[in-house]
Amino acid sequence: MKVMNNLKMAVAAVALLLMASCGSTKKMEGTGKVNAQNRKTETKAADAAEVASMKNLAFVQKVADNQVYAKNIVGNMTFNLQAAGKDITVPGKLSMRKDEVIRIQLFIPILGSEVGRLEFTPNYVLIVDRLHKEYIKADYTQVDFLQKQGINFYSLQALFWNQLLVPGVKKVSDSDLKKFSANLDETAENVPVSIRYGNMNYQWKANRNSGRIAEANVTYKDKGNGDSRLNLKYSDFKSVGVKMFPATQRMTLTTILNNKPQEAKLNIEMKSVKTDDKWDAQTEVSGKYKQVSPKDVLGKLMSM
């Protein structure tokens, strides 16, 4: 409709110019032709912009349509964490229930006993250290590296579930898709899809043909303390119903803590991806465990 309206306006404008020039000199007639040509140029530009907008929306819709329908994602995994000069690899398990919890359990090799648990819920972050019988429970504003990134549960959930996200929104709706920008002029296999929100910049790289997200980048601009960045790379996609889920996720976080640049890498390699729902989404911490300060979350993770 917008294209048709633009054409009608252009035709009307040309007609008015022709009528105005009927009793005028040749010079005025020439001016009418120039103005008519300008109108045609403007119409072509408007049409091109409309087509580009439709292509942008169609691609973003393709990316959004790749999200899995399952309520639960569960699977044993190999967990690797590199931070503070340490490199730790242990067996583990990833359990996620949509809109409720993201849980990472770490086990003692061979024995299989749980040594630690990292849990994200809509209201808090929970870290349980079984070896030292300690735990951290805090909301997202109390955890330094999450606060720096401006990350909450729903943004984390979208990143773990290999989906697009709109900051501050629980679920991306069809009307939200217009907020994303897809750089279809890129010639690479993956197309950048981005959205800005205040000091936050989110960018995904999605396959041009399938729309499947291969990488996500989150950047938080902070002039006072320096930028923070979170990069995720997805691979080894496995079938979950009619959709695909990345069994391997590699995350790199760079930020400033205590006025020093810090980098942490977290790698998850799931051996299988299941949709089992026979598990409790809430962790009850024993009264024998001591609650400690949430200030040094990375330190607590590395001490497990």
Residue spans of the language-model regions?
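N-terminal leader/targeting segments and the immediate start of mature chains
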Residues: 23-86, 294-304
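An acidic-aromatic
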Residues: 101-154, 158, 291-294
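Gly/Pro-enriched, hydrophobic low-complexity segments
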Residues: 23-28, 171-288
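Flexible, processing/modification-adjacent segments and terminal tails
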Residues: 57-59, 130-202
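Bacterial N-terminal signal peptides that target proteins for export
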Residues: 2-11
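C-terminal motif of bacterial Sec signal peptides marking the signal peptidase cleavage site
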Residues: 18-21
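Edge/loop elements at the starts and ends of beta-strands within beta-rich repeat scaffolds
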Residues: 65-73, 83-88, 95-97, 118, ...
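One face of beta-strands
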Residues: 71-79, 90-94, 100-106, 116-118, ...
